[in-house]
Amino acid sequence: MKTSLFKSLYFQVLTAIAIGILLGHFYPEIGEQMKPLGDGFVKLIKMIIAPVIFCTVVTGIAGMESMKAVGRTGAVALLYFEIVSTIALIIGLIIVNVVQPGAGMNVDPTTLDAKAVAVYADQAKDQGIVAFIMDVIPASVIGAFASGNILQVLLFAVLFGFALHRLGSKGQLIFNVIESFSQVIFGIINMIMRLAPIGAFGAMAFTIGKYGVGTLVQLGQLIICFYITCILFVVLVLGSIAKATGFSIFKFIRYIREELLIVLGTSSSESALPRMLDKMEKLGCRKSVVGLVIPTGYSFNLDGTSIYLTMAAVFIAQATNSQMDIVHQITLLIVLLLSSKGAAGVTGSGFIVLAATLSAVGHLPVAGLALILGIDRFMSEARALTNLVGNGVATIVVAKWVKELDHKKLDDVLNNRAPDGKTHELSS
């Protein structure tokens, strides 16, 4: 029993995170030097994301009987994303207005260090809807894979899958090669995941060593408010959606606990993307649905980021005593419904989109970003965890709506009645 516990990735990552926190707190200078360990692990994961998405989407689409099903899946997924992300934005807006974590700070915007957020404000100027749509189209296929742009790779994979499907029996050889290549890629993922504890340790040691617990205490009310809101969203909103779909959100969270710990350690939801593609398929969702919903969700279904954006914007308004009446808040909500979709594939995307939103709204000081710059890193864990759970739930819901979900397999796996790889007939 003890041997199996020590070999568990869940236990190893949890232990590594704890050691990283202790090292960063008591030996901050050494903790800061651990940054390459976390960065290296995330880079290894990002290295493999593009080929994983390509193989999963191509084999999923090419193996489908009807191409109409692909279009239906995409439309249903986008509808779900828009509804749930809107709910997340509204919940964030309500909670921050009720708790008012920024009230009483009385910060003069002219005293804030605008230089500290200048880089985010500059990048925000390019984050328009048209620019976002144009960025989905790659200048070259090789460039899409080289840059690791998820949406560009996804677009090419969908087109490739459609073309391969139209070839029929002539494309069988190519299909078999890609499927075999996919097995090799997932073998590489298994090897990389053995390094997850090292990556989690390095990332956590750096975070605590660099920013310290003092930053947490200074703006702790906003952090606590944000974490509680994310928990309520997962338990109440996603939990209700899960119950209506026929599964328990708590059993699902237990099923993806290793992926959640990896995300907690690295603060990057992308670090769990390859494993999520595999685990959602093993849970009973059709490969074509998983291949479309998970990668697209990383751009259009960022529930945690949506909550963060509304709370951060209103917090800055409260702290700087900027006017935020009902009209301003509705305007903020409408702007965020559009601007939040431009966060895909951008480093520091939350901050960039927030800067773009503050600029678009007009009456909120962009320099106010400096207030939360120091604690943003501590809130990124909750954002990433909520995003991951949200995309997992979305995959199951969409699979059910388009009748591509194996209900028996879902129930068996979540209740530990069947091994992950066992298959059943699709239910209608």
From Swiss-Prot:
Gene Ontology terms describing biological process: L-aspartate transmembrane transport
Membrane topology (UniProt): Multi-pass membrane protein
What Gene3D superfamilies does this protein map onto?
Sodium:dicarboxylate symporter
Membrane-traversing stretches: 8-28, 44-64, 76-96, 142-162, 184-204, 222-242, 326-346, 352-372
Which UniProt keywords are present, listed alphabetically? Cell inner membrane, Cell membrane, Membrane, Symport, Transmembrane, Transmembrane helix, Transport
Signal peptide span: none
MF term (GO), any: fumarate transmembrane transporter activity
The cross-references to PROSITE patterns, in alphabetical order and at most eight, read:
NA_DICARBOXYL_SYMP_1, NA_DICARBOXYL_SYMP_2
Q: Which HAMAP family match?
A: C4_dicarb_transport (MF_01300)
Q: Which PANTHER family match?
A: AEROBIC C4-DICARBOXYLATE TRANSPORT PROTEIN (PTHR42865:SF1), PROTON/GLUTAMATE-ASPARTATE SYMPORTER (PTHR42865)
User: What is this protein identified as?
Assistant: C4-dicarboxylate transport protein
UniProt lists the gene as dctA
